[in-house]
Amino acid sequence: MRKTKIVCTIGPASESVEKLTQLMEAGMNVARLNFSHGDFEEHGARIKNIREAAGKLGKDIGILLDTKGPEIRTHTMENGSIELAAGSQLIVSMDEVIGTPDKISVTYDGLIHDVSVGSTILLDDGLVGLEVTDINKDKREIVTKVMNSGTLKNKKGVNVPGVSVNLPGITEKDANDIVFGIEQGVDFIAASFVRRPSDVLEIRELLEEHNAADIQIIPKIENQEGVDNIDAILEVSDGLMVARGDLGVEIPAEEVPLVQKELIKKCNALGKPVITATQMLDSMQRNPRPTRAEASDVANAIFDGTDAIMLSGETAAGNYPVEAVQTMHNIASRSEEALNHKKILSARSKQVSMSITDAIGQSVAHTAINLDVNAIVTPTESGHTARMISKYRPQAPIVAVTVNDAVSRKLSLVFGVFATSGQNHSSTDEMLEKAVQKSLDTGIVRHGDLIVITAGAVGEAGTTNLMKVYVVGDVVAKGQGIGRKSAFGEVVIAQNAQEAAKKMKDGAVLVTKSTDRDMMASLEKAAALITEEGGLTSHAAVVGLSLGIPVIVGMENATSILKEGEDITVDSARGAVYKGRASVL
């Protein structure tokens, strides 16, 4: 079962209900809408189709709105493009002009105040590099030297590595797009070109003004300034996207893998989801199979600790959108098999100060690994407990049961968490019982599984204070257990020693009213013993202890409740009998 989440960008190649359904079946968890392209009508139609496809499949698919952000671009060029020659002089004007080989202009007129002589300006994702040689503030012009030849087309991106650019946190377009997203009920805002915490707070203020504070903000780190301010940015954010495209232009390419590892590590420490994005399976826009380097890139992001991996052009405009998702699913699933969960847990358990929820999350992860449980089940109001458990990367899947569909969708970015909708409860016992039932409904948990349940006060977020180890089973009957062992076997019912001698076989569970010394030969074959007669000093109790087999005494009507030949699990520690095979301690 894949735990890494997959984010898919939706575009012309994937916007139909039919194609979206195929993407979801292939493994898409979150749909990304890139607001650098398209209008409200297009994106509104895509959101409608996403919800229709998700509804058909009964899936909770998160929707992520990716803002265009406060970027810098060139204006238009003469005849659509110009040729720039290495060594030539190029003036960058703050006033809009038609671009020529001698002079171009940019959309941000404050650039002249941010750069200095010696600064580097990169055009079109670094295709052409410029070095600032002079600044003429009277003419509002930056004089540069072209570092390498290249063709420059209309409205290309401008990057200024190593320079703190005083662009606004969000533009007017971004604000309008976010308000549209609020009206459409999106789950995440991916904020482009975040440089400082105030950029995130501007968006949070806008969300609060529109009563949408529950929408999560995922800053995209795309420049050196964002990397430098990462700790402060994470304090006010709900997660992070490592946007390696622009980041690789702003900082040297050889630094990108190291920055990726560091950003992921910081998110892991805080229990905040992190998305690794850009060019993960880029060649699959054109080819049905990825390059070996791309497969390694996806795997290494998972080894680094990413919660989610993202597809951009591969699903938005590529020729093989469904195949790209399936490929990413296959690589992620195989890579997860190589994760050393004990090592990860040990490394992340060295945190000194923590909240009660964090402490419970760590304890749950330790218990899950030590007992090799089948699943972790957590009823949750806000999703916080599930995130805190995921932080420690337990091997067992985390089933988060929530009454809030929006919380369920927000957990679609969190590693190892499988959210399902529950219902309101009046007591903790009822909440736990219903959570176990919902986990059974998902198919992740089955009867006989050993699970860990963690929860808090009913209806209150942030109160997690309970952990329970539980066997999910059909409890057939109960009595008084002797010892702490368990056994699985076929039921043999005997009313007396003669019947027992005739029917008993090695490894069976002997069920009888009472035992005596005439039954010793049969008892020596038994995997477990159940009697209707009670008492810690009864013959059955004493003999069972001496033979070292699990015994349950005082089980009323055991010879009529249990059926000849049925398979059961005897748990003497709890004095319980489960139908079929159950995982008990």
From Swiss-Prot:
Q: Per UniProt, where does Mg(2+) bind? A: E222, D246
Database matches in SUPFAM superfamilies: Phosphoenolpyruvate/pyruvate domain (SSF51621), Phosphohistidine domain (SSF52009), PK beta-barrel domain-like (SSF50800), PK C-terminal domain-like (SSF52935)
**A Pfam family that the UniProt record links to this protein:** PK_C
Q: Which residues bind substrate?
A: R32, G245, D246, T278
TM segments?
none
Which cofactor does the UniProt annotation name?
Answer: Mg(2+); K(+)
Gene3D superfamilies listed in its UniProt record: Phosphoenolpyruvate-binding domains (3.20.20.60), Phosphohistidine domain (3.50.30.10), PK beta-barrel domain-like (2.40.33.10), Pyruvate kinase, C-terminal domain (3.40.1380.20)
Q: Which residues bind K(+)?
A: N34, S36, D66, T67
> Per its record, what are the GO molecular function terms?
ATP binding; kinase activity; magnesium ion binding; potassium ion binding; pyruvate kinase activity
**Residue numbers marked as site, Transition state stabilizer:** K220
Enzyme Commission code: 2.7.1.40
InterPro entries hit by this protein? PEP-util_enz_mobile_dom (IPR008279), Phosphohistidine_dom_sf (IPR036637), Pyr_Knase (IPR001697), Pyrv/PenolPyrv_kinase-like_dom (IPR015813), Pyrv_kinase-like_dom_sf (IPR040442), Pyrv_Knase-like_insert_dom_sf (IPR011037), Pyrv_Knase_AS (IPR018209), Pyrv_Knase_brl (IPR015793)
- Give me the reactions it catalyses: pyruvate + ATP = phosphoenolpyruvate + ADP + H(+)
Keyword tags:
ATP-binding, Glycolysis, Kinase, Magnesium, Metal-binding, Nucleotide-binding, Potassium, Pyruvate, Transferase
| Pathway(s) served | Carbohydrate degradation; glycolysis; pyruvate from D-glyceraldehyde 3-phosphate: step 5/5
Look up keyword ATP-binding and say if it applies.
yes
Per UniProt, the enzyme's principal EC class comes to transferase
- Residues engaged in binding ATP: N34, F35, S36, H37, R73, K156
Which Cys pairs are S-S linked? none
Query: What NCBIfam families does this protein's entry cite?
Result: PRK05826.1, PRK06354.1, pyruv_kin
The UniProt similarity line reads: Belongs to the pyruvate kinase family. In the C-terminal section; belongs to the PEP-utilizing enzyme family.
Binding partners and assembly: Homotetramer.
What PANTHER family is this protein classified in?
Answer: PYRUVATE KINASE (PTHR11817)
Please identify the protein, giving its name as recorded.
Pyruvate kinase
From which organism does this entry originate?
Bacillus licheniformis
